[in-house]
C-alpha cells in the first residue's frame, strides 16, 4: 500500500506551468488537515456573506478517501479481529493530523480497530507467529501505517532496525513497504527524468508528454563526464539550482551560496554521488495573510508563494492493482524569502486553492 503526495510549484519562466518539486512516499502529512481547512474556509466565506464564492473552493475529500484506503487494505487482510497500526514516535507534534485519520476510519468502519505503537513497542512486545503475522499485545496487525521511520534519527539503536525488519517480514500490509519507501528517494526522481524511462511505465504518447512537462532538469553527481559537468554548473551559477541529499523530513536541501560551498567541500568526495542537482523553480508571487501562533495580530498582507500537493493511494496484491486513485489536495504557502516551507517549523502555513477560471 502506498499513500503519496506529489508536490508542485509553478515555474514563472515557463508560463507558470506546474513543475514537480518532489514526491513523498512515506508519512505524507496534512492529508486530514487539508480537508478540514477546506471546510473551514467554506464556513468563513458563508459567514462573511460571500455565498456565490464558495463554489470557487474545490471539494477536498482527502480525509475520507485516505480512511477508505486503509479500510480497504484492512478488509483485504481478511481478519476482522486484526488491527491497523499507526507507527509513531513517543512524542508526536503532528498528532492531530494522525488522529483525524484514526477517527475517520472509526466513523466509516466502527468494527476496525486502530492502535498506536512505537518502534520500541514493536521491538519489546511484538513477535511473528507461525504464520508470520505480526502480533503485539495479543493483537494481530493487518496494516502498518508508517508515520515515522523516514530519517536516521528515528533509528538511534539496532532495536529500531530490528523492529523495522520484523514488520517488513510480517504478512501485514505496509504503508509503505520498504520498496515503496525507497521509491521516494531523490535518485529515483532523477532516473524518471531520463529519456526512455517513462516509456517503461506508460504507453500513450500524450500521457508521457504531459508527465514529462512537469519535470525540471535533474542532474546526477556521479564521477563521470555528466557528473563533473553538473558540478561546474553548480559552482558557476549556484542560485539556479537546489542541491538535494537522499533525505526526507525537510530542512536538508541547499540553496544559493550554500550550494557552492557544499559542492566545493565534496566535489572530489565519493559522497557527492548521493546528491542530485535540481533546476530551481521560481514561482510567481501572490498576496496573502499568514496567520501563525505568536505572530502579529492582525497579520500583515505579504508576498507569498504557494506549493500544490496532490495525494494519491495505491493498493496492489500479487501484481494486480486494487486501488489507484487521486485522493485529495493541499496548498502550503510561505514567504518567498524562505527556502523551506515547513509548517511545523513555522516557516509556512496550510492554505486552500481558490479557483478563478
Per-region residue spans from a language model:
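Domain-scale recognition of functional cores that engage charged ligands
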Residues: 9-15, 24-356
